[in-house]
Amino acid sequence: MSNLIPGEIIPEQGEIELNLGKEVKTVKVSNSGDRPVQIGSHYHFFEANKALIFDRELTLGMRLDIPAGTAIRFEPGDTTDVKLVPYKGLRIAYGFNSLVNGSLDT
């Protein structure tokens, strides 16, 4: 009888490098609002809360370079650098704040 649990993943020993080989952009972000803003790992950063001040054009088609299912919290008045990586696949985005609703490459 096996000791494996259904759906269990057993990774190899050592470090796992996220987004290996992807272009990484570093962007300075400031929260100009009076409330914290939290952005998840796969949120289209271009469409993040308007209280976050950053060069939005640089972030079109990008998401945070953090592990899936995690997030970064921006406290009011804070400024921090974040690393972003491009979306892959079809590069089509719908929803979020409805600023794109289509191709990320136009």
Swiss-Prot record:
It comes from the Bacteria. The keyword Amino-acid biosynthesis does not apply. It catalyses: urea + 2 H2O + H(+) = hydrogencarbonate + 2 NH4(+). Pathway: Nitrogen metabolism; urea degradation; CO(2) and NH(3) from urea (urease route): step 1/1. One of its GO terms (biological process) is urea catabolic process. One of its GO terms (cellular component) is urease complex. Pfam families: Urease_beta. Gene3D superfamilies: Urease, beta subunit. Heterotrimer of UreA (gamma), UreB (beta) and UreC (alpha) subunits. Three heterotrimers associate to form the active enzyme. This is Urease subunit beta. It comes from Prochlorococcus marinus (strain MIT 9301). The gene is ureB.
